[in-house]
């Protein structure tokens, strides 16, 4: 198996496109994304309606109603990883457990490679 890279992104996320253009196009990064990870991009602004609304409790104790696919992904990002901005990247194992912390918007190829490599190393342990 392979570790998963969760990419919390948005259709209207300018910084997400900048990361994809400046970091993901690097040959070494692209090789890792294509060969060493299962990449799952979750669009927090996806307006596709859910079949039925879902009421959830937020980390701060308030209640929220999820009505769209994007609502579901933003709730996952906030409730599981404690973050609510894009881009947000986290490597996880097959049970959804984080492997190497997280990475946010920073056009830093060596830093991003380090983040990806730590995820792979921890996955193999």
PLM segments and residue spans:
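Non-catalytic, surface beta->alpha helical segment in thiol-disulfide oxidoreductase systems
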Residues: 21-29, 58-125
